[in-house]
Amino acid sequence: MKDFRAPWWLPGGNLQTIWAALFARRTRAAPPRYRRERWTTPDGDFMDLDWVEGDTAPDAPLLVLFHGLEGSSRSHYAEAFADFAAAHGMRFVVPHFRGCSGEMNLAPRAYHSGDHEEIGWILARLRGRQTGPLLAAGVSLGGNALMRWAGEMEERAADVVDAVASVCSPLDLAAGGHAIGRGFNRLVYTTMFLRSMKPKALAKLAQHPGLFDGEA
């Protein structure tokens, strides 16, 4: 693994984060063409998974990416992962957390950083369909949930996946929550997240009246 060296003209995490999201080239070729598959969850809800399979062999490695807070298969990093997978002969899939695929989920729940049971259900189902190596990665919140699953599973995780990786995940949630609620982070990142989270919360309340206090 090579050490990351930021360009001299992008000092600091904020500039690197914002520039990558707004201006970086996501793929070396055309954007990925996803095939969507819908699963019924154990609680009667649904989950959408976006696949890129191309001309890969039946036993090709499968790279599973768990996206970050309010992310999706169209996030800049997801498209970059899809491009990497295609260039290395891998199949690729993004399982969307509840409510993140562009359609509101049905159950009176969303998703969270410690959602390891959801991660385990997804990976177990993919393992049952996959003959080749199964590789799992998570970005930010998705990495938190994946690492929680790996920690809960301990040695048994190796029976399901061949490798796991966490990218830019706020593993110390208390410190991360404190940091994102202050100064520049609050002004930029919190505002960005709330732009989609508030309408989703109100839509969920309309779907399930009385679920929480919408005036709080």
Regions found by a protein language model. Name each.
Residues M1-R26:
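N-terminal presequences and immediately downstream first alpha-helices
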Residues A107-Y111, I180-R182:
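Short glycine-enriched, charge-decorated loop/helix-capping segments at active-site entrances
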Residues E53-L106, W121, R125:
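Short, surface-exposed "cap/lid" segments of acyl-processing enzymes
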Residues R109-R129:
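Alpha/beta-hydrolase active-site loop
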Residues Q130-A216:
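Alpha/beta-hydrolase-fold enzymes
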Residues T17-D55:
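N-terminal cap/lid segment of alpha/beta-hydrolase-fold proteins
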Residues W51, G120-A124, L146-M153:
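Short, well-ordered amphipathic alpha-helices
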Residues D45, R74, H112-H116:
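Phosphate/oxyanion-binding active-site loops and adjacent basic polyanion-contact surfaces
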